[in-house]
Amino acid sequence: MNNIIKRFYKWPIRINEINKNNKDLIGKEIKVKGWVRNIRNQKSVSFIELGDGSSIKGLQIVGDKDSFSKLKYGSSIEVNGKLINSLGNDKEAIEVQLTEPYKLIGNCPDCYPLQPKNHSFEFLRDIAHIRSRGNSIGALLRVRNKSTQLIHQYFNDNGFINVHTPIITASDCEGGGEQFQIKSSLDTKESMFFGQPSFLTVSGQLEAEIYACSHSRVYTFGPTFRAEKSNTPRHLSEFWMIEPEMAFIDLNDNLDIAEDFCKYLIRNLLDSCKEDIEFFNKRIDTNLLSRLEKTLSTPFIRLEYKDAIQLLQNNNHPIKWGDDIQREQEKFITTHFGEIPVFVINWPKSIKPFYMRENEQTDHSNIMPTVSNMDLLVPTVGELIGGSIREERYDKLLNTINEMGMDKDQYSWYLDLRKYGTVPHGGFGLGFERFLQFVTGLQNIKDVIPIPRHQNYCKF
């Protein structure tokens, strides 16, 4: 039994601990609390399956034929009994034999929306406040939780400092204009609360650069917001981003770190969330495990943007140099390379944000200048990571700001980072929810965040 259970001995033992330590607990009296996930009544005996959210596997409770006659699906109960080896055909299975009547904690009426059957994800989105009691969202929450721990562990082990960047900002990192503006009840036509327009952040990158230029390796992991009027399986208005920022690196370093980070997360999730990912492989996407294992065993492809355009043109995709790559084209590229993640690098400057470092033009056949950047495309999801080397040259950055018609005074602080001891630096942003889609096989991004926020949906 782990130290937490020992220290807080009044807590009921959790089901995942029972499954993990059942050899030590066989024959012992235990107390378990949870929700009823299944009820089966037979002639001389009855069974319930109890779940407490700690494991995809429930715990079978055995009583006599009348033990659970009044119990309803979804109710919360306390059980006291002896842990025994199952009397059924599965000799590895365990169960709890009641030694006293269960204690009802919270009854669940017949109108309970979740029933012991398969519900559509669309239905579950309408009951987001209780959908986590089902297997799919319950498993997702455990994978999400472990992923969060692994993210912090990876950066801590590699000497990064975690920076809490602001949620409220005056900057638009991506330049798309899809920001939520903040207005206070104290705002008037003459004065604003912050003295200037302020918004919910679309990225912590610009602020993270401040600390990369003093502490070399930093990362931020927090919520970001986009006022996108899109109610699609790929869009959320509130989502989470992991954004490392590093001094003294080039594009190849950035690519190496991004690939290593992704593989670290996947490798450790396959080990620590094995049962949950096997559940997703069985119930959601039967190719999930093989795809993840292939991702681990194969180097990611590195493909120049110009070569990606040529590949698409050769396969009758309507695209030309200077165009962005669309979702279906992303899917084609990863499929073409055998369902392996693909970095597309060195994109046209004109379709990327202002802060990306302009490449030296050695190939004068290009119509437009390019920037030192990368987009990581992964099977089934599309773009997972966007990153770049940042423009560290003061004059180059100032020229780009002027060319794009931006207010240079608003970005004077950002230019100062280049004025005082500038260094080459870069980083990337990984969309947390898209990563969770990749490792679970869930197709709708609204199903991988606990409480989704999107256009026309903010119930609670």
UniProtKB/Swiss-Prot annotation:
GO terms for molecular function: asparagine-tRNA ligase activity; ATP binding; nucleic acid binding. It is found in: Mitochondrion matrix. Its main location: mitochondrion. One of its GO terms (cellular component) is mitochondrial matrix. SUPFAM superfamilies: Class II aaRS and biotin synthetases, Nucleic acid-binding proteins. Its EC number is 6.1.1.22. Keywords: Aminoacyl-tRNA synthetase, ATP-binding, Ligase, Mitochondrion, Nucleotide-binding, Protein biosynthesis, Transit peptide. It is an enzyme of class 6 (ligase). InterPro entries: Aa-tRNA-synt_II (IPR004364), aa-tRNA-synth_II (IPR006195), aa-tRNA-synth_II/BPL/LPL (IPR045864), Asn-tRNA-ligase (IPR004522), Asp/Asn-tRNA-synth_IIb (IPR002312), NA-bd_OB-fold (IPR012340), NA-bd_OB_tRNA (IPR004365). It holds the Pfam family tRNA_anti-codon. It catalyses: tRNA(Asn) + L-asparagine + ATP = L-asparaginyl-tRNA(Asn) + AMP + diphosphate + H(+). GO terms for biological process: asparaginyl-tRNA aminoacylation. Belongs to the class-II aminoacyl-tRNA synthetase family. This is Probable asparagine--tRNA ligase, mitochondrial. It comes from Dictyostelium discoideum (Social amoeba).
